[in-house]
Amino acid sequence: MNTLEKWYSVIKSNDLNDLEDLLADDVVFYSPVVYTPQKGKEITKVYLIAAKKVFGEIKTRDIKSVNKNEGPTFRYIKEIVNGNSALLEFETEVDGIYINGVDLISWDERGKITEFKVIVRPLQAVTALHRIMQAVL
């Protein structure tokens, strides 16, 4: 199983304890609502678990489904892979606010995620995420 398949498996399973094996010890996480990069496996897990709580459970059979009539609203709608990095575009809705964003993920030769960057639009989405993530963290 490659790194992206493992990532999809982790978020589908709703068991984020599997993040331990997927993240490099020195992974760097870039949040759309925090100015400084968050360095290290433990803090990255904290942010990813909080994001999972905010976005809700993923219950669809195909996480890349774009059928808006199925399951929860979070879904990846585009995947671009180049070597050891990927751009995963997603859309979701939180508190009635449409969120469009990308996860930029890079990994090393062992398949461990070394960088995870989240970019979100529009401004209302960033503002809402900031408020909600503060409450969760």
Positions of PLM-derived features:
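C-terminal and inter-domain tail/linker signature
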Residues: M1-L137
